[in-house]
């Protein structure tokens, strides 16, 4: 809708990442020169037969001395990703586990720590499981992800087709074009939400195995 595109445009304008150019060299100021109605029409035209530009891959340093791959979409693709995010996020937020805190609105590591304290005090839970999935973002299975999005209740075929196109967008790195079979680039606006969709089943399973599993002892306080 026009309202969704305008809201996405306003959110993109407030993002520092919008001043980082993708493969076409354009940033948010290149969009801001157009009247808002022109921006809306351009987005609508792109969505009719959506084909994203290549994602520019770069690397940033991590705290442990290693590097993390970062995918930078073109500014117009960032705007379209924001439009899709605003459609998906309210639906998915209602389905995510209450203990999930990563990459979610109004949640942080502080929320996770507070939840841990509460579970220790009220539920007598004292174990922490530390899991690190190697190369997680780069190894997400596209077909399974689309099925998980469908299971979330997002079943509009046009929206799903746009997400598929985003996932299959070519990656440009050092003049080499890579056609991804798996993964979603870190740096994309939609990637954090997609990663949470992938992990949602795991969140609920972990809770069923520890937090909510019936115990032979009834704890009282």
Model-derived segments and their meaning:
Residues 1-37:
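Non-catalytic, polymerase-adjacent accessory regions of viral genome-replication enzymes
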Residues 25-31, 100-106, 132-137, 182:
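Conserved short loop/turn motifs at secondary-structure junctions
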Residues 32-44, 150-154, 194-212:
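A short, contiguous, amphipathic alpha-helix enriched in charged residues
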Residues 220-221:
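Conserved small/polar residues in nucleotide/adenosyl-binding loops
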Residues 67-96, 182-209:
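Conserved pre-motif C helix in the palm subdomain of viral-like polymerases
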């Amino acid at each position: 809708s026009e309202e969704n595109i305008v809201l996405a445009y306003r959110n993109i304008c407030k993002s520092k990442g919008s001043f980082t150019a993708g493969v076409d060299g354009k940033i948010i100021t290149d969009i801001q020169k157009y009247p808002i109605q022109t921006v809306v029409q351009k987005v609508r035209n792109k969505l009719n037969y959506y084909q994203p530009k290549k994602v520019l891959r770069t690397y940033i340093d991590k705290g442990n001395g290693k590097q993390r791959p970062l995918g930078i979409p073109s500014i117009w693709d960032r705007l379209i990703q924001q439009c899709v995010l605003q459609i998906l996020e309210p639906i998915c937020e209602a389905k995510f586990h209450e203990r999930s805190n990563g990459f979610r609105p109004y949640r942080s590591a502080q929320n996770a720590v507070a939840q841990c304290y509460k579970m220790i005090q009220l539920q007598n839970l004292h174990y922490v499981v530390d899991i690190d999935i190697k190369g997680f973002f780069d190894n997400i299975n596209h077909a399974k992800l689309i099925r998980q999005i469908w299971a979330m209740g997002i079943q509009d075929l046009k929206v799903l087709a746009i997400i598929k196109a985003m996932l299959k967008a070519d990656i440009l790195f050092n003049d080499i074009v890579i056609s991804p079979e798996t993964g979603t680039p870190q740096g994309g606006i939609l990637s954090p939400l997609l990663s949470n969709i992938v992990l949602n089943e795991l969140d609920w399973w972990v809770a069923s195995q520890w937090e909510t599993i019936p115990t032979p002892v009834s704890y009282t306080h």
